[in-house]
Amino acid sequence: MQEKTGSPVLRNARRIVVKVGSSLVTNEGRGLDADAIGLWCEQLAALVKDGREVIMVSSGAIAEGMKRLGWTARPKAIHELQAAAAVGQMGLAQVYESKLRENGIGSAQVLLTHADLADRERYLNARSTLLALLQLGVVPVINENDTVVNDEIKFGDNDTLGALVANLVEADALVILTDQKGLYTADPRKDPAARFVHEAKAGDAALEAMAGGAGSSIGKGGMITKILAAKRAAGSGASTVIAWGREPQALIRLTQGEAIGTLLVAQTQKIQARKQWMADHLQMRGSVAVDAGAVSKVRDEGKSLLPIGMTRVDGDFSRGDVIAIRDAEGAEIARGLANYSSSEARLICRKASSEFERLLGYTGEPEMVHRTNLVLTR
């Protein structure tokens, strides 16, 4: 970890995903702050006019919906939150459309769910649409489609959504703007010896230990969600900046190469696009546990997973679904596309491929997950 960053990452970035937190676009959670959004839109427009492609992932729909509905306390019932989101999305889209249009730039509203990104065809359709919008010089304003999702299929927070969008469009950089100046070695509110982290490698295990709990009562994500988002975005080669959103002209200064906030640098080697799609699954239909020999073959030697190395099959999945591969302790080591359904996998678990025809009634692939359809996660 470095004390100072002079990295050209943002200066050279042509495609940027910007995530702005609730506290930066609302009046302390009481509706949208149109003036603040206007300042963001001025910067977004300047970046587009400079030849960059920009996507905005913005919170604020529920806060705006609560204001329009006259609610003073955030509801706990999921259907009430969904109702607030539906009402608030109208206002959120209107403000961004108005403020960007004032700066001569078009906007588009895009609402995503995890199901959109988990399904390969819908994933590719979403990617094609976003890339088309960027080529047209339009700024897509993205939020989770809270109206139709529940806790089991939510992204969970917009930090995660920002990282997934960065991977979806293969962005050069992810900028997470928050109400904190960046990452410290400890909570500076509790530890006067806490040092500011200017630069580190995304995915550095020490970062997660540094991150505290939730920072703001308005949004959902604390620093830990931002650290994990940076780790996820790094898979497609996107470096991440976590910066204080109240910093004047933060986006402009970052893209001019100024050191603001914490820079989390991505690994140099990108994950193949299709494997990145598999890695980005937040929920999976099932998993298989494997023995130590299979762990070594898959993780250390880059081999396919054979059914003879499986010890247990969990969940209910179909052929072609993304499943997790876990070691004896239950830790995920990889994930990939299943060549067999869960019911078939249970029949061939611990069996050699020579027995498949007798057990299944047909001769299929010898692998449970072929190495070309497998991505390591640990």
Swiss-Prot record:
Matches recorded under InterPro entries: AceGlu_kinase-like_sf, Asp/Glu/Uridylate_kinase, G5K_ProB, Glu/AcGlu_kinase, Glu_5kinase, Glu_5kinase/COase_Synthase, Glutamate_5-kinase_CS, PUA
SUPFAM superfamilies named among the record's database cross-references: Carbamate kinase-like, PUA domain-like
GO cellular component assignments: cytosol
Biological process (GO), any one: L-proline biosynthetic process
GO MF assignments: ATP binding; glutamate 5-kinase activity; RNA binding
Compartmental location: Cytoplasm
Chain sites annotated for binding substrate: S59, D146, N158
Residue positions binding ATP: K19, T178, D179
Catalytic activity, EC: 2.7.2.11
CDD domains: AAK_G5K_ProB, PUA_G5K
Record's keyword terms, sorted: Amino-acid biosynthesis, ATP-binding, Cytoplasm, Kinase, Nucleotide-binding, Proline biosynthesis, Transferase
Top-rank lineage group of the source organism: Bacteria
Similarity comment: Belongs to the glutamate 5-kinase family.
The protein's name in its UniProt record: Glutamate 5-kinase
Organism from which the protein derives: Polaromonas sp. (strain JS666 / ATCC BAA-500)
Gene for this chain: proB
